[in-house]
Structure formats: structure tokens, C-alpha cells
């Protein structure tokens, strides 16, 4: 099990860096592509869902290196028919699974997955960690997403420990809003330790703010305790 994030949603360099995989096709779901007009073969990239041969996929990427905004690209061995592939739930783009400590390709038959997120990052996950090792030689930021998530979920548990000690019956909605607002303010892209006293002040201030004026954005509570 392994996952790395690469700071691009163009796949030409990513595909070139990957080692040779067993013969496979690409199941592409929840697709949103920036470059869907003005070149031969572009029409298919305006669809939300595709099943392409590896040859066709790589030819188009090599020719155009189009930017993907969203999409899940699942490499599935050629021995499986389309009917067999569709027996399982199709992979989704907007899912919290990429915040987990352990990340696998969503489709049970996939050996590797590319996930384009909001036009800026690609998450590459595989059932064998060795498949991802060459990606660390790419230019730009390449990060071990599982390692980053373990740190993040530890930080979220610190926030929740303080909140639940003070407010044992806190609602999931408020708990989720508090943990993310505090995490973004104190931990996101910052180094150094945050003291318990300072964190407690921030957590309780955000809790009071949420009670007075709850966040209007719907959310599903992300449980960092489930990631231990």
C-alpha cells in the first residue's frame, strides 16, 4: 500500500516515470478535462467516464499532455472484461479516502490509480509500493501522502482530545468544523510545535465561534481516531 502526491495534473511525465506495468486498460471516472476541443481524438475527453486501452491513453497524453481538473484513472489488467469491471462501485473523485493513513486504489481490480484533484495535484496509489519509487525522481514536489496523512491525523486527534474533554457531547458537525478550521490555522504548511495551552485557546475560541454562527457548508465528520 502506498500513495504519493505530485504537484501537477498533467500526466506525461508521471506516465513516463512509472515502471512497466502488466498489460492493462484504463477505467476513467468522474472526468473533467481542460483540453477537449481542437485536436484529433479530443471528443472523448469531454465525457465523464471512459474505458481506454493503455496504448490509446498514452498516445493522447503524449500528443497533447492535457490538463485534467478532476478524474480517477484506474489501471486494470486486460484479463478483466468490462462487465467484470462494472460489478464493483466505480471510483469517485470527491472522496475523503485520500486523507487516510493507508491508501489503496479505489477499484478492487486496479493495480495502480491516478487521481487528479482540482487541477493542481495528482495522487498516485498502488498495491505495490515499489511501483511508485521512480516518481520521487520527478521535478517538483513529490510527497509521501500516507506519511503526511499520519501527521495530519495525529494533529487532528490532538484537537479532538481537547474539544471532547471540554465538550463531551459536541455535535459531529461542530466537531468537524472546529478541527479543520484550527488545523488550517495552526498546522497547515507550518513547522514547529504548537503548545497544548495555545492549542486549547484556539480550539475553544473556534468552538464558541461555531456555536454562535455555525458554518453553512455541509460536511461529513472526518474521524481521525479511526486512523490510528
Where are these regions (language model features)?
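A broadly conserved detector of short glycine/acidic/proline-rich loop/turn motifs that flank catalytic sites
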Residues: 32, 77-79, 128
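Ordered hydrophobic segments in well-structured contexts
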Residues: 3, 25-29, 70-75, 113-114, ...
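Extended non-catalytic scaffold regions that mediate assembly and binding
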Residues: 173-176, 217-228
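N-terminal interaction modules that seed assembly of large macromolecular complexes
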Residues: 2-5, 9-60, 182-183, 187
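Surface-exposed, low-hydrophobicity interaction/linker segments
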Residues: 40-115
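Acidic, low-complexity, intrinsically disordered interaction modules
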Residues: 173-215
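Short, aromatic- and cysteine-enriched interfacial helices/patches
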Residues: 162, 167, 186, 191-194, ...
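Acidic, proline/glycine-rich low-complexity IDRs
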Residues: 103-161, 165, 218-224
Amino acid at each position: 500500500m502506498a500513495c504519493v502526491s505530485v504537484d501537477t495534473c498533467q500526466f506525461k511525465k508521471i506516465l513516463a516515470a512509472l515502471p512497466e506495468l502488466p498489460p492493462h486498460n484504463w477505467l476513467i471516472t468522474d472526468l473533467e478535462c481542460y483540453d477537449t476541443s481542437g485536436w484529433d481524438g479530443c471528443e472523448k475527453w469531454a465525457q465523464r467516464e471512459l474505458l481506454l486501452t493503455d496504448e490509446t491513453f498514452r498516445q493522447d497524453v503524449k500528443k497533447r499532455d492535457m490538463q485534467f481538473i478532476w478524474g480517477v484513472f484506474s489501471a486494470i489488467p486486460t484479463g478483466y472484461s468490462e462487465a467484470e469491471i462494472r460489478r464493483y462501485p466505480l471510483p469517485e473523485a470527491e472522496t475523503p479516502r485520500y486523507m487516510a493513513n493507508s491508501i489503496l486504489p479505489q477499484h478492487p481490480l486496479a493495480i495502480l490509480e491516478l487521481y487528479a484533484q482540482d487541477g493542481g495535484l495528482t495522487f498516485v496509489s498502488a498495491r505495490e509500493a515499489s511501483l511508485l519509487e521512480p516518481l520521487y525522481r520527478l521535478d517538483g514536489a513529490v510527497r509521501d501522502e500516507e506519511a503526511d496523512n499520519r501527521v495530519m491525523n495525529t494533529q487532528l486527534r490532538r484537537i479532538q482530545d481537547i474539544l471532547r474533554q471540554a465538550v463531551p457531547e459536541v455535535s459531529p458537525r461542530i466537531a468537524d468544523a472546529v478541527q479543520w478550521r484550527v488545523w488550517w490555522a495552526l498546522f497547515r504548511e507550518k513547522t514547529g510545535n504548537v503548545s497544548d495551552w495555545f492549542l486549547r485557546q484556539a480550539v475553544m475560541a473556534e468552538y464558541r465561534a461555531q456555536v454562535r454562527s455555525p458554518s453553512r457548508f455541509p460536511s461529513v465528520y472526518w474521524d481521525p481516531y479511526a486512523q490510528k
